Amino acid sequence: CSQSDNQNQAETSDAPPSLIEYVWHKAGSDFSEDNLSMLINSWNGMIDDAMCSGMMGANILTPEVANEGYDFIWVLLWDSQNSRDVCWDDWTTNLQSNWDSMIEGIMQYDLDNVYLFGWTIGQYPKIENTSGSFVNRFNFCNYNEGYSEADLDTFRDDVAATNWSDSYWYGLLDPKFEPADPAPDFVWLDLWANSAEKEIAQNKYNNSDLPSTTGAAFTCNNVDFSG
């Protein structure tokens, strides 16, 4: 679900975010959709009054398959590293203690699992998603033996040659931290407006020759979310 801005609106604007940050969260005993909505509204107000003008939007990702490390992920979109640092400094100094009291029993954030990535859009959607929700897939990929970034460029050209679904778009995430081994060679993020569009695109891909041609250059681990 979206919060201060819709991710697709933010990321397909004339000035898309240059950084995306993912903060792991666990639900508490008092967690509910109503309590989450209340916290989102409070958080939006706090951010509006904070030194966070460089935050371009935020949303929440819910995994399609349960993960023991998190129940959901709070996503922050930034226009620059400096803007991100200024906002976090202000938050930590002036707002965090109040927020901790507000969320007690409802949810917990994990500051040991905060992951910042550079963001480069690879392809824009044919039709902008204005629904306020979306689905996505993270692909953590490693080159197979004998392949390299040049083969990824060829694959990207092949992807661009097909309309997989009207709402489909993707980008590449560049970690601004040291990934745990085995570190991916690249992280590819697919996005769609809904599950139906996702299924259309995946069926087209699986029935194409890409999995056995340029798509055979790498092997990926996939993680799916709704937002």
Each language-model region and where it sits:
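Short S/T/G/P-rich N-terminal loop/turn motif that feeds into the first structured element of a domain
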Residues: 4-227
